[in-house]
């Protein structure tokens, strides 16, 4: 397990939660392709040195799928990752109609266990356009390799990862393990981000509450089954076609 985690997590100065979704085993015996799809905290924090690290590892991102709200995107420069033109920025807000409420976002980020899972399920109800846009892009091989991300890489990114991995036939145990790999930013990184965003540095004191707790994802997955029946039913309700779902599987699975 340790070797897998080391291979999955990319050590970068700007982003603490940049990792590869490759290697997870699907129920049909296939595995998720390595170096094809990544999840992360906001790519705006990547440094020039980080880009060199990615290049040295043979990682070239064709696209970045930004799950943040319009307010978050407008608040700060999109980052050096997009400056060269090699990586295209695609804005796919997870909740386009309500995410500018910072207090509500903080409440969601800090909740754990059953409350955290229920919060996730409420947010999911607004995410149909996001999933439709993301799956349409992942079904197009020319839009890969890519990374999707929110602010911290935990909540919105965690929900997208759960739905995506379920689509690929990955077990709930592996999905929960992937969620739990998400680490809270270091205090130094948090303080730097708060300063760059013009936010209250005292928010950095909540580092412990920003960690990803497995029980939150457990409750989310159980509630997802209760509300939606299956991942296919959920995706179809987002107006994602069966052929699109199958192309996503073909692009992201091997073996």
Language-model features: locations:
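Ser/Thr-glycine-rich phosphate-binding loops at phosphate-binding pockets of nucleotides
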Residues: 152, 156-157
């Amino acid at each position: 397990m340790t070797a897998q985690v080391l291979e999955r997590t990319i050590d970068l100065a700007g982003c603490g939660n940049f990792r590869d979704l490759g290697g997870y085993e699907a129920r049909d015996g296939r595995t998720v392709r390595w170096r094809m799809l990544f999840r992360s905290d906001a790519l705006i924090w990547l440094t020039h040195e980080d880009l060199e690290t990615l290049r040295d590892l043979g990682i070239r991102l064709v696209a970045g799928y930004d799950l943040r709200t319009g307010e978050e995107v407008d608040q700060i420069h999109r980052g050096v990752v997009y400056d060269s033109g090699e990586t295209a920025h695609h804005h796919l807000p997870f909740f386009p109609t309500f995410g500018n409420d910072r207090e509500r976002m903080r409440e969601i980020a800090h909740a754990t266990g059953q409350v955290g899972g229920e919060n996730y399920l409420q947010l999911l109800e607004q995410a149909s356009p996001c999933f439709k846009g993301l799956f349409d892009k992942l079904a197009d091989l020319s839009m890969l390799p890519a990374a999707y991300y929110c602010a911290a890489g935990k909540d919105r990114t965690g929900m997208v990862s759960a739905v995506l991995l379920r689509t690929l036939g990955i077990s709930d145990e592996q999905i929960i393990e992937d969620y739990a790999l998400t680490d809270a930013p270091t205090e130094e990184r948090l303080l730097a981000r708060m300063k760059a965003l013009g936010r209250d540095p005292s928010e950095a004191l909540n580092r412990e509450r920003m960690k990803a707790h497995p029980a939150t994802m457990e409750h989310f997955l159980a509630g997802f089954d209760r509300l939606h029946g299956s991942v296919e039913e959920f995706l179809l309700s987002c107006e994602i076609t069966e052929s699109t779902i199958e192309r996503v599987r073909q692009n992201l699975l091997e073996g």
